Amino acid sequence: MKLLLPKAYISQAAADVRKATARVNLISMVIADHDETHELIAEIEAAALRGVTVTVSADVFTYGEVSGSFLPIKYYSKNAKLATHMAKKLRAAGVKFSWLGRARLTIFNGRTHSKWCVVDDTVYTFGGVNMYEKGVDNVDYMFRQVNKRLADRLVYEQGRITKAERTTTNYPSVAYELDDETVLIDGGIITQSVIYRRACELALEAKSVIFVSQYCPTGKLARILKRRDTKFYFNRPEMADTINAMVLRLNTLLSRIKTHYKRNVYLHAKFIIFTMEDGSKVAITGSHNFAYTGVLFGTREIALETKDPNVISQLESFYETYIA
């Protein structure tokens, strides 16, 4: 697996889609045709026009994000209309495009945070990059690998999500082995998160921890990490928009945790590196913020639990270069 920064992810994925012969599957919380993402969006449209099976799923939260609002209700702003136009254009080209989360009880419940791009048997996932201008500018990454088994599974999972949306339902979290690693998928059931549970279990075993996320940890995980030698990195409230700033202030107040993050670029990467008593290391990397709020509201997520030295060394290098 290779860690790619957001711009490299867009460029490499576009090049792969250009050569796609069978399938392209893209899912993200936010998808918009901005200058920073246009190369990939254009290649996705072209792939559908030449007969490749293309499926794209985006959360309706897109409308809020592109309109400069936390709430996904500005469907008629200029930028929101552009998002609607993008969806119509992709559908006209033959893309199976769907908006996720339209019928949820609240703006938080049932949100789809999962992110992946499957091109034939090439997979981009286990990172947090949203497919729009700000998403590309954030401190973030995606991992790229060629793995047919993973590609097949993610195409299947996207189908499950689409089916669940038709009846406004969710499905249980699942963990499954992938070679020597474990893929963790949260299906959106309220209070159920295999990703959060594994983070708590690993934290209990760890001697020291590097915690990186958009938000401060909350709940059981926060309590465990405070008892360990943990370096916490998450955004300062003044770096965020109004609602996110309120969330950060409230979470830090409740958890009584201070961030070590001193840089000025918005942090959106999400991973934890656990160092065990014997010196071995385990990492979780993906879309989950590791805040219990998301667990309570039932967000859909994906993450990888890994002991692979190559993956962990790439995360450590990313940490040293862009976060510490």
Please report, for each region that a protein language model flagged, where it lies by residue.
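Charged, low-complexity intrinsically disordered terminal segments
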Residues: 1-96, 102-324
